[in-house]
Amino acid sequence: MLVDSFNRVIDYIRVSVTKQCNFRCQYCMPATPLDFFDGEELLPLDNVLEFLKIAIDEGVKKIRITGGEPLLRKGLDEFIAKLHAYNKEVALVLSTNGFLLKKMAKDLKNAGLSRVNVSLDSLKSDRVLKISQKDALKNALEGIEESLKVGLKLKLNTVVMKSVNDDEILELLEYAKNRRIQIRYIEFMENTHAKSLVKGLKEEEILDLIAQKYKIMGMEKPKQGSSKIYTLENGYQFGIIAPHSDDFCQSCNRIRLASDGKICPCLYYQDAIDAKEAIMNKDTKNIKRLLKQSVINKPEKNMWNDKNSETPTRAFYYTGG
């Protein structure tokens, strides 16, 4: 079992399989050239697999595959199948922008993936183009429908931005509700790679907009996880991830492995442990040691709710958000 200095059990790893992305979203990497990462040094997926087997043996019960855009990584379905075969009790989920999802959904489902989280920031084509610098809405929606068709569980993630997509909060909720998908609204998390003009809506502002149409009956906070779950009068549930107001760090159960082999204890802080050599050598003893050290290094909490704190400098496309 992996336990940090604050007695939190760490049983969830987010694994970035690439920094590359086919989008250039305003809140993540808007100014990065599309070919910027052509020469990136990636950990071979077989080596990542061995690392994750060790992590599973140490008590990890959930693995999320991220990027960049993870569906750009070749051989991903085979990697997931091998991971699933090693321990079928481990939940395997994936975060994607959905652009390549339609053609890959069936293979991902057959490989053993249990759920997909799709970023959907707008239902308007021109707005998606403005946000992501990609004419991507049609592909994303088709990917969502195909995932439902093949039986993949789904969640939608929406980063809510002032004067960008805040007028679509209800429309996006209706879209998700009609498909029995949970949508999670995410407060914009300031970082030095985002456009400086991007401003997010806070949790209470999002709730006020939803309350204009729906009666919110209650809220529950899962013991683990970063989102609060709200229930509407009709029984539909949606989530809000609010790092500026919610101290979800007290129940944090995760660490992150970047595509270059660094283990990141926290999304906010720059600190990381370089495990590349151990992973490349499949050095079980050292991997265990570095894994445990990264857990011990986890800070008590992030600082997004501190107005005097510095803006995080490590890119979300590096750690996988």
From Swiss-Prot:
Q: Which positions fall inside the Radical SAM core domain?
A: 5-233
Q: Which residues cross the membrane?
A: none
What is the protein's species of origin?
Helicobacter pylori (strain P12)
Q: Which GO terms describe its molecular function?
A: 4 iron, 4 sulfur cluster binding; cyclic pyranopterin monophosphate synthase activity; GTP 3',8'-cyclase activity; GTP binding; metal ion binding; S-adenosyl-L-methionine binding
Protein name (record): GTP 3',8-cyclase
According to its UniProt entry, the function of this protein is described as: Catalyzes the cyclization of GTP to (8S)-3',8-cyclo-7,8-dihydroguanosine 5'-triphosphate.
Q: What class of enzyme is it?
A: lyase
Q: Which UniProt keywords apply?
A: 4Fe-4S, GTP-binding, Iron, Iron-sulfur, Lyase, Metal-binding, Molybdenum cofactor biosynthesis, Nucleotide-binding, S-adenosyl-L-methionine
- Please tell me where [4Fe-4S] cluster 2 binds in this chain: C249, C252, C266
Binding residues for S-adenosyl-L-methionine, per the UniProt record?
Answer: Y27, G68, S119, M189
The family classification in the record reads:
Belongs to the radical SAM superfamily. MoaA family.
For this protein's source organism, the top of the classification is:
Bacteria, Pseudomonadati, Campylobacterota, Epsilonproteobacteria, Campylobacterales
- Name the needed cofactors: [4Fe-4S] cluster
> Might you give the EC number(s) for this enzyme?
4.1.99.22
Tell me how the cofactor is bound: Binds 2 [4Fe-4S] clusters. Binds 1 [4Fe-4S] cluster coordinated with 3 cysteines and an exchangeable S-adenosyl-L-methionine and 1 [4Fe-4S] cluster coordinated with 3 cysteines and the GTP-derived substrate.
Subunit structure, interactors included: Monomer and homodimer.
Recorded catalytic reaction(s): these are: GTP + AH2 + S-adenosyl-L-methionine = (8S)-3',8-cyclo-7,8-dihydroguanosine 5'-triphosphate + 5'-deoxyadenosine + L-methionine + A + H(+)
